[in-house]
A protein has these predicted regions:
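Surface-exposed, active-site-proximal loop segments in enzymatic domains
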Residues: 17-20, 57-68, 107-109
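Extreme N-terminal starter segment of soluble prokaryotic enzymes
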Residues: 2-9
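Residue-level recognition of beta-strand->loop/alpha-helix junctions
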Residues: 11-13, 50, 121
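A short, hydrophobic beta-strand-centered structural micro-motif
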Residues: 73-98
Length: 148
């Protein structure tokens, strides 16, 4: 049986600044939530963001990680889940976050009911990122209501 699936992809602007991280993070989160609302209103079945959507770039220092990284689960995944539930939309949100007590480049998978149903941890980290982040150990696929 065929089924039409509406997919939205969103890439945030790339920004680099070591002195304006608070502002950049706030602006990126605003763009994330605004873009999701638009995708939801357009009937998107799944919306996918580009890598490290919550920052796009962060100067790699332990101080920055401790101060600016989000936790998974946490306030951002809760808000993403609320939007997913409101529009009955799956969301794949790549975030640089602390999950399970470890700094990871993770893609969070949220289903239509707003629940976090999976996480993929980036396996092959760039050298600079590998100094701080823990790589994933396997390539994963996830089942969604319309396919894998």
């Amino acid at each position: 049986m065929e089924r039409r699936v509406v997919i939205s992809t969103i890439q945030l602007p790339w920004r680099r600044s070591s002195s304006e991280l608070e502002r950049i993070k706030a602006e990126n989160l605003g763009l994330i939530f605004e873009s999701l609302e638009e995708a939801g209103k357009r009937g998107s079945d799944v919306t996918v963001f580009g890598e490290i959507a919550n920052f796009v770039h962060i100067p790699w220092t332990k101080e920055n990680f401790n101060r600016y990284l989000d936790t998974v689960p946490g306030p951002i995944t809760e808000r993403l889940g609320n939007i997913a539930q409101r529009y009955s939309m799956n969301i794949i949100a790549p975030l640089f976050a602390i999950t399970g007590g470890k700094i990871r480049n993770t893609a969070v998978i949220i289903d239509r009911s707003g629940e976090v149903v999976g996480q993929y941890f980036k396996v092959h980290l760039p050298l600079e990122e590998a100094k701080w982040a823990v790589p994933g150990e396997e390539i994963l696929t996830f089942d969604m209501d319309f396919g894998r």
